[in-house]
Structure formats: C-alpha cells, structure tokens
C-alpha cells in the first residue's frame, strides 16, 4: 500500500484520492482506511523514508547544503508531494514530526557550512528550508527534459544568495 501511495502521490500530489491509492495497491478502500485512517497518516508513512534518506545522506561530516539540495532535486523528480507535506501546516503532530526532523538536519548543515565559511552569517535555517521547497517545486513542475536546467538556475540563485559577504 505504501509503494502504491508513493506512486500515486508522485503522479497526483498529496490531493490524489484514496481510491486511486487503493486501486493501485489492489485493495479495497476499506483495507486502506483500516491501515491508514486518514490522508495524513498515509502520507507520513510514505514520506518517512524520504526524511530518513535525507538524514542518512547528510549525516557524514563532509556533507553540505549543496548535498542536501542535490538530494532534494532527486526526490523532487519522483515526488513534490514530500516537499508539500514537510512544508505544510505543521499543526498535525505527525507532519510536525517529519518537519522537525527535516528542520534539524537543515540546522546541522547551516551550522556546519557557516563554520566552514561556505555560507554567510546572514543565512538562516529558514532560508535554506525555503530554498529547498522552491527548488523542489520548480524542478518537479518543469518538463522532464528541462529539469536539469531548472535545477541549475535555482542552484545558481541560491549560491549567490547564500555566499559569504
């Protein structure tokens, strides 16, 4: 069911109907609801893997904000629904938990890059989080053949904005 939901969200975003997920999974909607009582429960189950991947990818001490942005581009090609979820209204504790994990890894990278002189002292965690969301959205919205160029343009803007002054 989670694999089916990942595919459906990749195609239709978080607003894709539960019925589409159930159909793709080859189960009835009742079965889907028994395991996942609402859309958020299913989305969180699907995207825990994305957060874990970002955490693992950025954990080594030599990893930077650039490494995070590269991985976000890879994930955005598959699904903007993940970025939609972690930048959504965080009043739901399940979503807030994923958002907090993402925020913690960005905090770590900002501190690391600032200490190494790779970014300016003016760069805040919220700036990088916003850049991540913008990058993922632009890449996912672009035609597949134009995605590398869209990512390069966005990355050039962020590099200029984040550079030490």
Task: Describe the predicted segments one by one.
Residues 62-165:
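An extended, acidic
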Residues 30:
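Key DNA-contact positions within bacterial/archaeal DNA-binding proteins
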Residues 1-10, 94-95, 99:
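A short, flexible low-complexity segment enriched in Lys/Arg and Gly/Pro that occurs
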Residues 2-3, 10, 14-15, 19, ...:
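An amphipathic alpha-helix adjacent to DNA-recognition modules
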């Amino acid at each position: 069911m989670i694999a089916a939901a990942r595919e459906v969200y990749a195609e239709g975003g978080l607003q894709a109907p539960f019925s589409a997920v159930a159909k793709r999974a080859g189960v009835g909607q009742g079965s889907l609801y028994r395991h996942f009582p609402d859309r958020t429960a299913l989305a969180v189950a699907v995207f825990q893997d994305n957060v874990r991947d970002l955490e693992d990818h950025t954990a080594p001490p030599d990893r930077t904000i650039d490494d995070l942005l590269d991985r976000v581009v890879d994930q955005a090609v598959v699904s903007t629904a993940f970025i939609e979820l972690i930048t959504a209204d965080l009043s739901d504790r399940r979503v807030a938990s994923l958002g907090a994990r993402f925020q913690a890894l960005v905090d770590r990278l900002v501190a690391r890059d600032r200490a190494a002189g790779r970014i300016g002292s003016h760069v805040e965690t919220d700036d990088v989080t916003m850049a991540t969301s913008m990058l993922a959205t632009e890449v996912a919205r672009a035609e597949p053949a134009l995605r590398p160029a869209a990512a390069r343009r966005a990355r050039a803007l962020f590099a200029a904005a984040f550079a030490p002054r």
